[in-house]
């Protein structure tokens, strides 16, 4: 899947200047932040909770660990990891978008999750953390919005401890023709109408559908992780490959 030229990239199906994409993506998430959780439940029929639960179980977080929830948005994974790592552990919820970060902070504080979570506005391509710092990094439904995915994956490798684990949960490519046809119909005909009804913003959800189609498929993303230096890379398809969880280790 082409990422464009050195100076250009994809914003959905559009080709844009690479330096413009971050601002354009920011505009999408500023627009949808307040209704993001509601839309996740509606557009996935609640199944996103099952995908995230599998990701958390696969992470194997234990008391005392340091976890980075990258592109953590409204904090679904952070909330679970906070309980798993306990008082001696630390979870960092990082997101490039300050609107999403604000929603996540308020949501977790309303739940009483305050002691072992910190919040950082950060670009995945240049993470502001020391080398060999985290035991686990997760990025759920965020990588496809990153301009330079290869740089982001290398940045994640740098801040992982030796023996650390990266988990990428992302929309991917359905494995069967029937599912692909149903998924296309849903994504391009129904999803934007849902976005218009719930958030008064059909255009942002058109972008989200297009960004999923432009994201590297399962094997391509696996290869990108291997090229960055991750080892024992594997992926698990869920819901016929509509979503895939990629996992790799730093040794």
Swiss-Prot record:
One of its GO terms (biological process) is methylation. It comes from the Bacteria. It catalyses: a 2-demethylmenaquinol + S-adenosyl-L-methionine = a menaquinol + S-adenosyl-L-homocysteine + H(+); a 2-methoxy-6-(all-trans-polyprenyl)benzene-1,4-diol + S-adenosyl-L-methionine = a 5-methoxy-2-methyl-3-(all-trans-polyprenyl)benzene-1,4-diol + S-adenosyl-L-homocysteine + H(+). It holds the Pfam family Ubie_methyltran. PROSITE patterns: SAM_MT_UBIE (PS51608), UBIE_1 (PS01183), UBIE_2 (PS01184). The keyword Ribonucleoprotein does not apply. Pathway: Quinol/quinone metabolism; menaquinone biosynthesis; menaquinol from 1,4-dihydroxy-2-naphthoate: step 2/2; Cofactor biosynthesis; ubiquinone biosynthesis. One of its GO terms (molecular function) is 2-methoxy-6-polyprenyl-1,4-benzoquinol methyltransferase activity. Keywords: Menaquinone biosynthesis, Methyltransferase, S-adenosyl-L-methionine, Transferase, Ubiquinone biosynthesis. The keyword Methyltransferase applies. Its EC number is 2.1.1.163, 2.1.1.201. Methyltransferase required for the conversion of demethylmenaquinol (DMKH2) to menaquinol (MKH2) and the conversion of 2-polyprenyl-6-methoxy-1,4-benzoquinol (DDMQH2) to 2-polyprenyl-3-methyl-6-methoxy-1,4-benzoquinol (DMQH2). Belongs to the class I-like SAM-binding methyltransferase superfamily. MenG/UbiE family. NCBIfam families: MenG_MenH_UbiE, PRK00216.1-1, PRK00216.1-3, PRK00216.1-5. This is Ubiquinone/menaquinone biosynthesis C-methyltransferase UbiE.
